[in-house]
């Protein structure tokens, strides 16, 4: 199994999840601008969409889209308990979180990373992100450590990665103390440290 990733991108969530399982896997970085992998392969031949993540399942084909990759990792390694049991309300709540993070929060950051975005456009994006963070802060105010149930799930990995982008886009997480604590809690997990170290994000 091989994960194609871009350092610090949303694929980091899948990288963290793989470390949580303790399974054997490979990683290969992708330059989404040139469309080449670090080994010189044509990434579009692997994933025609051109973005990350992509999980090569060897003879099982290539799986794309972050939420799908995360759920596959969780479901194929049930002992890691990275997702509630299928068919339960807890599972539906986790999927609800994954969908919202992907379609609302993740998307809101887009202009902040897009080349050519004007300063006005970036300011508007920061306002949009702040509104999403307000919603998360409200959820976390009840004292919960994790988004779903009482343990870490793949939804936490995804929220951590996207929320952590605030630190690179001029958004001060101190405005949302519960979210800031959530990000810190996730960053301290061995899986997150291992994945970030492998991607060259930390020493």
Stretch-by-stretch model annotation:
Residues 45, 188, 197-198:
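Phosphate-coordinating loops and pocket residues in cytosolic domains that bind phosphorylated ligands
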Residues 119, 201-203:
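Carbohydrate-binding/catalytic loop surfaces
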Residues 85-86, 194-201:
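Short, flexible loop/turn segments with low-complexity composition
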Residues 97, 101-191:
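GST-like fold's C-terminal all-alpha helical module
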Residues 74, 162-163, 196:
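Active-site-flanking alpha-helical
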Residues 1-124:
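GST-like domain detector, emphasizing the conserved glutathione-binding G-site
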Residues 35-37, 183, 203:
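Generic structural signal for helix capping and beta-alpha/helix-loop junctions
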């Amino acid at each position: 199994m091989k994960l194609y990733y871009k350092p610090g991108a949303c694929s980091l969530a899948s990288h963290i999840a793989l470390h949580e399982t303790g399974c054997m896997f490979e990683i290969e970085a992708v330059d989404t601008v040139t469309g080449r992998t670090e080994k010189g392969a044509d990434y579009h031949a692997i994933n025609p969409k051109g973005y990350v993540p992509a999980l090569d399942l060897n003879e099982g084909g290539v799986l794309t889209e972050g939420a799908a990759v995360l759920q596959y990792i969780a479901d194929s390694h049930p002992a890691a308990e990275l997702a509630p049991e299928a068919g339960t309300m807890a599972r539906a709540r986790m999927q609800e979180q994954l969908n919202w993070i992907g379609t609302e929060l993740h998307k809101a950051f887009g202009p902040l990373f897009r080349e050519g975005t004007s300063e006005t456009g970036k300011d508007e994006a920061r306002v949009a992100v702040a509104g999403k963070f307000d919603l998360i802060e409200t959820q976390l105010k009840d004292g919960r450590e994790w988004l779903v149930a009482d343990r870490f799930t793949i939804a936490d990995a995804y929220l951590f990665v996207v929320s952590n982008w605030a630190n690179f886009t001029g958004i001060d997480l101190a405005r949302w103390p519960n979210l800031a604590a959530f990000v810190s809690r996730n960053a301290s997990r061995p899986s997150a440290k291992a994945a970030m170290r492998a991607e060259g994000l930390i020493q």
